[in-house]
Regions:
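Charged, gly/pro-rich active-site loop segments
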Residues: 75-137
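Short, surface-exposed beta-strand-loop junctions and turns on beta-sheet-rich folds
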Residues: 49-51, 70, 130-132
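Structural motif
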Residues: 40-41, 60, 82, 121
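Extreme N-terminal tail/first-helix region
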Residues: 1-17, 136-137
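Short Pro/Gly-enriched beta-strand edge/turn motifs at strand-loop
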Residues: 13-18, 95-99
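Short, intrinsically disordered, mixed-charge
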Residues: 54-61, 97, 101
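Charged, amphipathic alpha-helical segments
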Residues: 2-4, 48-49, 98-100
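Short beta-strand segments
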Residues: 14-48, 55, 62-67, 75-78
Length: 137
């Protein structure tokens, strides 16, 4: 498989990853649940979070996704991207699932926003002894 095929396979099977933002020149990471179309990632959050404040100031993010098996040599992705914050109801309905109910009243909840991550580069790591490979967009 080539790097794009490996990345797509990891994105299809891995939904929980870390998302980093920057505040006062310091990185902050948190676990997020991701959905994707092609190589664009989407994740839901409340517009009242620190991460939204941070992304409004600096839309750059770094995401780790994958590393699901034993933890030794598992392939994973390092994704550098730019975030767009959307409150578009069509997109919220598309991303909505029942797991979001504890935090939101539904896809039309005014506090729900979708973070759209457009990748600048995806680095495929730990490919069974092969060197990392970077996909640029």
């Amino acid at each position: 498989m080539n790097a794009k095929e490996i990345a797509k396979k990891i994105m299809d099977s891995s939904h929980v990853g870390t998302m980093a933002t920057v505040e006062a020149n310091k990185p902050f990471s948190r676990y997020m649940t991701f959905y994707h179309e092609d190589f664009t990632l989407y994740t839901a959050t409340s517009k009242k979070t620190e991460k939204v404040d941070e992304l409004e100031k600096n839309p750059n993010t770094h995401i780790l996704l994958g590393y699901n098996d034993e933890g030794y040599g598992d392939a994973y992705l390092e994704i550098a991207g730019t975030v767009t914050i959307s409150d578009e109801v069509r997109l919220k309905k598309k991303i909505w699932n029942e797991h979001m109910k504890p935090w939101f009243d539904g896809p039309e909840d005014p506090n729900l926003v979708i973070l759209k991550v457009s990748p600048d580069a995806i680095r495929v790591m730990n490919k069974k002894g092969e060197s990392p490979e970077t996909i640029t967009f």
